[in-house]
């Protein structure tokens, strides 16, 4: 839980590739990014099974900000980047041009998320342990 709010963060992952805020979703249906705009404007929407799920990505900003605030206020200098991720568990992924991000939020499956978390190394084991302890203390599980 995030103190001072009614909201929670599903998962905070500290991995070799950095700090990630992961929101897991068990939606069903085909995942796509569609342009719902008209002839003279674009209006991209994240859809799952035809339903507009754009608000899921748009709502992750406060979660990232909450984690960044804890890191900055408690000595992480410089604070590592915090990457928002929507992890869809049961969606149908298109064979070609599967969405990789939407409004700055990574769009992943459980399999692809594992690759993202280990794709690069920006944190040492000691740094990851320190960040994990800090975040566990300041943003406790409920």
Positions of PLM-derived features:
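Phosphate-centric recognition/catalysis
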Residues: 10
């Amino acid at each position: 839980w995030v103190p001072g709010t009614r909201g929670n963060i599903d998962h905070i992952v500290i991995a070799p590739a950095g700090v990630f805020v992961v929101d897991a979703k068990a939606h069903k249906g085909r995942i796509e990014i569609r342009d719902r705009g008209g002839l003279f404007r674009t209006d991209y929407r994240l859809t799952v099974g035809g339903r507009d799920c754009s608000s899921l990505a748009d709502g992750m900003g406060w979660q990232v900000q909450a984690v960044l605030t804890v890191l900055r206020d408690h000595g992480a200098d410089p604070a590592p980047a915090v990457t928002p991720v929507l992890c869809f568990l049961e969606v149908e992924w298109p064979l070609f041009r599967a969405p990789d991000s939407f409004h700055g939020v990574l769009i992943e499956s459980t399999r692809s998320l594992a690759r993202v978390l280990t794709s690069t190394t920006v944190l040492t084991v000691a740094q990851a342990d320190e960040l994990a302890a800090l975040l566990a203390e300041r943003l406790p599980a409920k």
